[in-house]
Regions:
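Phosphate-group recognition and catalysis centered on beta-loop-alpha active-site segments
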Residues: 1-149
Length: 149
């Protein structure tokens, strides 16, 4: 009797495990199956800065989607730039959120001819897929509202 109960219990345990196992036939979402170039397909050693138009064009050419960082300037323009501070990428002191776009547009990224792009310029590239990270702790609401325009 005990062996019969144990066999029935074991059968039900195996049935539960079988029914709740991951199904490999379930289609994965694009987010899980596509490849994304983080901040564009950049290569600082080759003079292709992160979050630059050149990096995004390179990613598009090689078939990647792109992850990028968006933040709002003082005058409400959406720019693609990772750091809150400009120093690492431009050599200039200052915060993106405290400067107008007219003060940013002539800055060069890592000494190249690449500049800080407007988000609209990146959208105009018609990239395959985009993952957009909203930067700046104080201005998230402004960025979201600007994205919705």
């Amino acid at each position: 009797m005990m062996w019969t109960a144990l066999a029935i219990f074991s059968f039900f345990c195996l049935l539960v495990i079988y029914l709740y196992r991951p199904n490999p036939r379930i289609r994965k979402t694009k987010l899980c199956t596509n490849h994304y170039a983080h901040r564009g397909l950049y290569d600082h050693g080759s003079g292709i800065p992160e979050n630059s138009m050149m990096a995004f064009r390179r990613a598009k050419h090689q078939g990647y989607g792109c992850e990028l960082d968006v933040q709002c300037t003082k005058d409400g323009k959406l720019v693609v730039f990772h750091d809150d501070d400009l120093k690492r990428m431009t050599g200039v002191e200052g915060l993106v959120s405290q400067l107008k776009y007219s003060e940013l547009e002539n800055l060069r990224l890592l000494g190249t001819n690449e500049r800080i792009p407007l988000f609209k310029e990146v959208l105009d590239l018609d990239l395959k897929e985009l993952l957009i990270e909203i930067k700046g702790t104080q201005a998230r609401q402004r960025v979201v509202l600007a994205l919705l325009k």
